[in-house]
Structures are given as C-alpha cells and as structure tokens.
Amino acid sequence: MLEHALIAGAFSFCIGISGLITSRNMVRAPMCLESIFNAVNVNSVVSSNTLDAEEIKGEIFAIFVIAIAAAEAAIGLSIALAIYRNRKSTRVD
C-alpha cells in the first residue's frame, strides 16, 4: 500500500511539474500547481500514517496546504480574470 501511494504521489507531482513548465496558459498553470500540492498532501498523509499511526501531523499539514491552495487558487484566478479583461487572452508571453 505504501509503495503504491508514494508512486501515485510522485507520478502526480511529475505531471504537475511538467505541466507547469510547459504551460503558457494562466488557467492551466494554477491547475498544475494544485496537482503538485495534492501530490505533496498524498505523500505527507501516507508517510504520517506509516511512520507513526498515533500522531496526525501529516493530516494537519495536509489541511493547512489545502487551505493555502484554496486561497492561492482564488487569488490566481481573479488575477487571470483581470488580465483577460484587459488583454482578451490568458496566454503568458
């Protein structure tokens, strides 16, 4: 179970990094960043449950990351919307 979850987290992290590097769209980039954050959350929760099942440090860390990612997504999409209104495009050039 541990290996499968860590491999899935690493795969999601790699997809997010490659999407973030190759993305030229202001809507796709935050989605790739969310994928990276979710991969970190998966690895944190799995590692926390494996190493010390009685402590919930990994789960608490994941909740904080989710809260920060939600705020980042809201701010990022509002900035993208404002730029779209001015430039009529969401491409990053």
From Swiss-Prot:
UniProt keywords, alphabetically: Chloroplast, Membrane, NAD, NADP, Plastid, Plastoquinone, Quinone, Thylakoid, Translocase, Transmembrane, Transmembrane helix, Transport
UniProt xrefs under Pfam families: Oxidored_q2 (PF00420)
Enzyme Commission numbers on file: 7.1.1.-
Catalytic activity: a plastoquinone + NADH + (n+1) H(+)(in) = a plastoquinol + NAD(+) + n H(+)(out); a plastoquinone + NADPH + (n+1) H(+)(in) = a plastoquinol + NADP(+) + n H(+)(out)
Principal location listed in the UniProt entry: plastid
Topology class, membrane: Multi-pass membrane protein
Transmembrane region(s): 1-21, 60-80
Subcellular location as annotated: Plastid, Chloroplast thylakoid membrane
One GO cellular component term noted in the UniProt record for this chain: NADH dehydrogenase complex
Biological process (GO), any one: photosynthesis, light reaction
Top EC category: translocase
Single GO MF annotation: quinone binding
InterPro entries, per database record: NADH_UbQ_OxRdtase_chain4L/K, NUOK/Mnh_C1-like
Subunit structure: NDH is composed of at least 16 different subunits, 5 of which are encoded in the nucleus.
Family under the similarity heading: Belongs to the complex I subunit 4L family.
Main function: NDH shuttles electrons from NAD(P)H:plastoquinone, via FMN and iron-sulfur (Fe-S) centers, to quinones in the photosynthetic chain and possibly in a chloroplast respiratory chain. The immediate electron acceptor for the enzyme in this species is believed to be plastoquinone. Couples the redox reaction to proton translocation, and thus conserves the redox energy in a proton gradient.
Descriptive protein name: NAD(P)H-quinone oxidoreductase subunit 4L, chloroplastic
Organism field: Anthoceros angustus
